[in-house]
Amino acid sequence: MKRIVLIGAGLSTKSLVPYLKDRLESHQWYLRVLDRDLKVAQHRLGEETSQCSAAAIDITDTTLLELELADTDVAISMVPAHMHMNVAKACLKLSIHLLTASYLSDEMKGLDQEVKAKNLVFLNECGLDPGIDHMSAMRLLDGIREDGGDIRLFESFTGGLLSPESEGDNPWRYKFTWNPRNVVLAGQGGAVKFIQEGKYKYIPPHMVFRRTELINVSGYGKFEGLANRDSLKYKEAYQLEDVGTLYRGTLRRPGFARAWDSFVKLGMTDDSYVIEGTNDLTFREYTNLFLAYNPKDSVELKLKYYLNIPQDSDIMSKLVWAGIFSDNKFPFEKGTPAQCLEFILKRVWSLNQSDKDMIVMFHKVGWSQGGELKMVESSMGFEGMDSSKTAMAITVGLPLAIATKLVLTGQTLKPGVQMPITKEWYGPILDELEADFEVTFSDSMVDYKGY
């Protein structure tokens, strides 16, 4: 009986665990679900059987971790990204295949030779973004190359958004569908880098939310695309060393970025220092911390003046709706500006039970072939069922689950530290997502448009 150990049983495993559990008997697998919180592990697994069980674990306890991993065939690590190496080192020592949905770190890359020497697979970036974005992009790019095309332009965007039917009167047309902290801290990791028409381009952190691209995705409407931090790191992986334009980004509804930029300019997304005495502050007083002293003007007036926001601007209506001027108080004694903003936004941006989220992915590829310039737009939209069965959780967990099946069923897979960017990975994973789960892409040829 093949043994699978899942380490970390958070939101992203909501579809992963049922997929594996449904196949335990037919494939003769055993599933062990581990989490630092026993109740979380038990809740995620559901009823224990002779082929599945749950337990608590502290993965910083190397002895306990190795004990749990003994005689395991595949480990799936869904712990915070900075803790993957704890699991990776144990897997390497015990000769266990490892799968994660997280970005491939330099430290993980450094294990490549040792992983190959043991004929192991250490698969990373096999979720949604990163994950399905890589696989769908490489399917497009490989197909064009096989037909003799020379890639000149590649753009890719993904957004975790609200389904239109759940937007209601929410002026942001957005709620948290994933880790709120990551949303609040977005854009703070240094300058954005990409290539446009053969020129390297850079956007400093304070301008990330002012430089957006308008994108119309057929069937899903208009969006604004915000550049991801480093598109260039995928040049080699995508075999795009000579491409003229390479740009990866995030989708939001129009108007989101300008309003969010207000939080950035105020300093509310700063996570580098702590505000003391927050339990004595209202949200309104917190907002006033970032504005000049003027006892005669209201907080709203000072903010509009400081940020040069017109009275009737939809930016102001978004800020009011977000609750930064309310008299609610913080329940904690101290926190960074970013932590305080996250607390405020979670009150209005947490999904209600009936809310549906939506994933939208969009690729644009331009190439030359036989003296002609061609372009294809490829899009995918996928809606969740409700706040417990979200599109985000489904599309993050299922690729990993299918990849686990590929490893355990003896598919011909090359060893090493890798991403799912070869046909041996993206072929069967995308095929199953489309056939069984309706995660489908629609491609359309359009007139070539450069910059």
Task: Show where each model-derived region lies.
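Rossmann-fold cofactor-recognition segment
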Residues: 48-60
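Helix N-cap at the beta1-alpha1 junction of Rossmann-like dinucleotide-binding domains, i.e.
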Residues: 36-40, 105
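Rossmann-fold NAD(P)-binding glycine/threonine-rich loop
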Residues: 102-124
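C-terminal catalytic/substrate-binding lobe primarily of soluble NAD(P)-dependent oxidoreductases
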Residues: 143-451
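ADP-ribose/adenylate-binding Rossmann-like module
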Residues: 90-108
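Hydrophobic/small residue at the entry helix of a nucleotide-binding pocket
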Residues: 12, 16
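Conserved Rossmann-fold cofactor-binding substructure of NAD(P)-dependent oxidoreductases
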Residues: 58-70
